[in-house]
């Protein structure tokens, strides 16, 4: 999204970005949340599209239901992967936001559950 804004030479508040799933136009808060989540903008029907928070939450839930492989705490994840959780790509299990290094460490210290969904680890972010 950040590259798209630069390419189009527009600001986040002026970009008209519909949700890929529900087709409603995303408001500034939704676009800011989408930008922070570092999810990709897609092109469909010659139109750039994102995903509103409501649809991202529904998608995250549906993917957990359908594609969940295993569940465990950070120590299990590190043993399985052979790397510290800070080095892994981890998304929020609720809103699909990309977790920061500090959020991953907090999740480990708080013994939060990590869920393997579609070959990617997920746990809750600070906002959720």
Feature roles, as predicted:
Residues 1-128:
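N-terminal pre-domain and mature-chain start segments
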């Amino acid at each position: 999204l950040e590259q798209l804004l630069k390419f189009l030479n527009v600001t986040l508040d002026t970009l008209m970005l519909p949700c890929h799933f529900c087709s409603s136009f995303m408001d500034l808060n939704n676009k800011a949340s989408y930008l922070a989540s570092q999810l990709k903008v897609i092109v469909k029907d010659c139109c750039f599209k994102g995903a509103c928070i409501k649809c991202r939450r529904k998608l995250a839930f549906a993917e957990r239901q359908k594609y969940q492989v295993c569940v465990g705490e950070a120590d299990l994840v590190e043993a399985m992967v052979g790397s510290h959780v800070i080095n892994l790509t981890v998304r929020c299990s609720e809103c699909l936001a990309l977790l920061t290094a500090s959020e991953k460490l907090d999740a480990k210290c708080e013994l939060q559950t990590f869920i393997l969904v579609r070959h990617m680890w997920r746990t809750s972010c600070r906002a959720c």
